[in-house]
């Protein structure tokens, strides 16, 4: 387990990018699959049904779950594939691409495509589909991949099995963007706005039917591009919120529960469940609008808030992980090797001093922060956060809203920032992580402004064009120090992706970057 003490002493073996030139020669997803099933004798056949208490956040936007944007959940790799994939160590690997290279500053990227890949309808996947998919994802109106919309200027075919991305600005870490959960490859159409609604992908399973607010059914793709994969005949998924997850598991309805509630771990184990937990997972970022006349416009109040939160208590009480990492008030994740811990974990006396200096010697009551319980433990988590802040004289209510319609609600006023709220933050590479508090993101910095913000943006652009990993590391540390000093938002940290499965299921693995797993090509069941 990677804990805070290891981060502070530098003794942990920490996940990271490695040397950039290796990106183009990275081992493929096939190597990962082969290594995972090495020395096993997988059984062919069987049906696996999973329950997932965490629906796709975009379900309220469309009932057309055949499109990867609106699938039942965001773990879409069973039906679709992307050009690249991020492995369990957060290293990027080729998926439908076989290699990728860039010019010196990372402003132009060329991808070579895997040959002989077939869509579920029998059409071969070529550069026509890859270019059209990329343009769909980058489209200003209907595109759903924010990093494409920020960075992709245009996309060009390079023969039948290649494409070229021309970016708006350099980004030496761009292959991570082509692994995003919405960046799936779809069948090209003349009108790219119409793409994706047929449910046709290149993944190991073919979609049979879907009600994206309830369940989906899929069957084995006999023409999958990994020979002999998958092993299962059918894969089905069901949204299983609240007690439905544990009840469905104990009754035998579900073989697997993805994103299991940590408060139910003991019940799952008593029912014979086997747990798998990733090193980290999605996290919670508090968006604090600073463009309105609110008390936290004063940086001293924001610093006091951060110092008052008992993050180790969250890890201990909610996750039973007392030595887990804690948020550093950036979008960085504890498993990033570039992660820089806050110099002080918690200091109630300093929090009170800052409040008094800001004109609140008797404490302060702050505007409510809204959340929806995307993850089942959230109501308990925010209770711990709120109670710990009271010790410093800070009263802050965390108000629960339904997840269906949550985004329209929080974004309905004070555009483009919206209401005070918590946003979900997936574990990503450092450039994408740190871009979320920059001028590339209109909401999550919360209206952060001033010299620190300008310097932060300059450093982000510099890091994106820097091919030397050591130099990028120094830049990323400087950026994190700026954010920790000005606290544009607050990161809780410590959460880990987990799943539970029955004893007869093999190779079900939770992934730090939630949407990259499980790799169903590796999964098989005993008779």
Question: What annotation goes with each model-predicted range?
Answer:
Residues 50, 122, 255-259, 387-442, ...:
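Periplasmic binding protein-like
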Residues 223-267, 395:
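Ligand-site clamp/hinge motif
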Residues 74-77, 86-91, 171, 179-234, ...:
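Gly/Pro-rich hinge or "lid" segments in bacterial periplasmic/extracellular proteins
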Residues 499-527:
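Long beta-strand-rich cores associated with HINT superfamily self-processing modules
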Residues 41, 153, 395-406, 432-503, ...:
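Extracytoplasmic/peripheral linker and loop segments enriched in polar/acidic and small residues
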Residues 323-357, 374-380:
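Structural transition elements
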Residues 49-104, 135, 198-202:
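N-terminal lobe/hinge region of extracytoplasmic solute-binding protein
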